[in-house]
Amino acid sequence: ISGPWSDFFRALGAVILYLMTSIVVLVERGNNSKGAAGVLGLCAAGLFGYDAYITFPSGTRRHTAAPTDPADGPVR
């Protein structure tokens, strides 16, 4: 398991869980603390979404191959 992919799926799973929980809390009518918890959960989901966004491209970048020919001509 590669590091960037596992970090991406960790952040993606957190986004899904926070979104589901926050939407359920916001849909239920209750006191103001439930509303605040739902809004803070949506903010946390946004932060985890941003983390997933910046993590995914860093794992897909490729490095250029190192040159194999000597720079000053063939070796004798």
Curated annotation (Swiss-Prot):
GO terms for cellular component: membrane. It is found in: Membrane. Keywords: Glycoprotein, Membrane, Transmembrane, Transmembrane helix. Residues 1-60 form the MARVEL domain. The keyword Cell cycle does not apply. The chain crosses the membrane at residues 8-28, 36-56. It is a multi-pass membrane protein. Glycans are attached at N31. May play a role in cell differentiation in the intestinal epithelium. This is Proteolipid protein 2. It comes from Ovis aries (Sheep).
